[in-house]
């Protein structure tokens, strides 16, 4: 039985990447050592981290005036680091279109109790369970504000921001954790992009930060570890980095390049997700909660059956049939198919066949 992993993260990795990592596991590049036990100051690891950065720059067309940093702590740590580095004494706006955006805003509010800045909720659709993206009037934004924070893909709710809104000249910071390298964005539209690795980049343990140099803080932070400038000046080596996660990420970047780059990857993802959306749309058994088709995520597709009881039955039977981790997030229920870059098209085709069979048997 073929296993298809629909996990929202940590998520499926490309099989060629896993096979290469397996082949190099005990002896990387003739060194006689695994990357797991290699010094982060060695030439071999220097080649790995520089190669990872160079390939990512090529894939995303990252300009020279942006720094690429590999950090620890997950994207959730950035919820604290961002206001700590950039917002002191200023306003900071948050556009909340999903659960992770709300967490970023909540952390900012917490921090504002001890650090002087003003977090402002620019827009939220929590009252309609994030079934669509929030809107706002750009004239409501103070042009002297530190930044506008948004999430480009809402992993739990299945919506995505493809066109970056006008923010009245205020720098945009984006959490791109779940659709980085899956859809094309112009890096220059952002002052900073960050992404946890465990969806489209690699294994958990590393977070990629892409930040414009002139946006970096010029005041010392409370902690060197939480200071973007120090991390950037030390080329991600201020302390021991998550070396193996960076190595796997490098292999994933090379795999995306071999596929044809981000533009080709987006084309594949739209075709792949389109198969499932088209079936759900014509079905009278399943529904997708996203109200506007143009806001649908290509990475995360939530859906429900006619009842919670049938949802539970679907998850149980799907799991037994090899469709793993398809249960929806605990906060929303139902089912969720996470179709990240490495997820195979055949898995979508077979899922649809299972969905058809289940619908007939339970109509």
UniProtKB/Swiss-Prot annotation:
Matches recorded under Pfam families: Aminotran_5
UniProt KW Transferase keyword: yes
Biological processes per GO annotation: L-serine biosynthetic process
Binding partners and assembly: Homodimer.
Family recorded in the similarity comment: Belongs to the class-V pyridoxal-phosphate-dependent aminotransferase family. SerC subfamily.
HAMAP family cross-referenced by the UniProt entry: SerC_aminotrans_5
Name used for this protein in its record: Phosphoserine aminotransferase
Organism: Streptococcus suis (strain 05ZYH33)
Organism placement in taxonomy: Bacteria, Bacillati, Bacillota, Bacilli, Lactobacillales
Gene: serC
